[in-house]
């Protein structure tokens, strides 16, 4: 459901007593297969037809991600676009009183295009300025923070890097390949790295 009213960071200040926070992610590939009625077994035990079905399932998961409802949607891209518009973009704007949703959307698109490399907040601000969107670096930082707190993107950092490098050029990935896919025209390598990052975050 909507996260505009409460995010996980608000629980401690809203609920009294003891509580346990459990993060829920989109399906892993194993969960996706189970929900699709496909059983994962050792590759050498699969028939040719079963291998073909498994490859088809992975192709769908790789491109459209693991949101449960997307499994039954004929227009998966339309569903994911609507999900982004209604839940993520709408919730971020409502929760954080973002008056210019266009600038936020373009910033998120730039995050999608940068998913394979560390981002520079200054560079994003300059890129947006070049297309007529005048926002400061502090606003870009806030927008990225809003997207992270709303579970649209997740941040992974190089623990071996120096502190200044960690903070100034972090790497961000989308919480699901399906959400990343709607922003990209040539998505293959970006989707692959994003899928690995999601698996790392979900199981770390």
Model regions: which residues?
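Interdomain motor-coupling "hinge/lid" segment immediately C-terminal to the ATP-binding subdomain
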Residues: 4, 8-118
């Amino acid at each position: 459901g909507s996260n505009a009213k409460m995010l996980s960071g608000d629980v401690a200040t809203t609920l009294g007593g003891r509580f346990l926070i459990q993060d829920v992610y989109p399906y892993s590939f194993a969960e996706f297969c189970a929900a699709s009625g496909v059983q994962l077994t050792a590759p050498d035990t699969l028939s040719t037809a079963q291998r073909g079905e498994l490859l088809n399932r992975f192709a769908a998961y790789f491109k459209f991600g693991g949101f449960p409802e997307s499994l039954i949607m004929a227009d998966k891209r339309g569903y994911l676009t609507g999900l982004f518009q209604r839940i993520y973009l709408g919730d971020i704007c409502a929760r954080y009183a973002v008056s210019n949703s266009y600038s936020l959307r373009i910033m998120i698109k730039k995050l999608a295009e940068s998913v394979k490399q560390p981002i520079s907040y200054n560079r994003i601000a300059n890129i947006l300025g070049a297309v007529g969107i005048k926002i400061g670096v502090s606003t870009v930082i806030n927008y990225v923070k809003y997207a992270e707190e709303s579970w649209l993107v997740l941040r992974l950092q190089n623990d071996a890097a120096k502190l200044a490098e960690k903070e100034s050029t972090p790497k961000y990935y989308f919480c699901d390949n399906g959400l990343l896919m709607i922003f990209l025209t040539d998505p293959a390598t970006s989707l692959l790295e994003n899928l690995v990052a999601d698996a790392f975050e979900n199981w770390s």
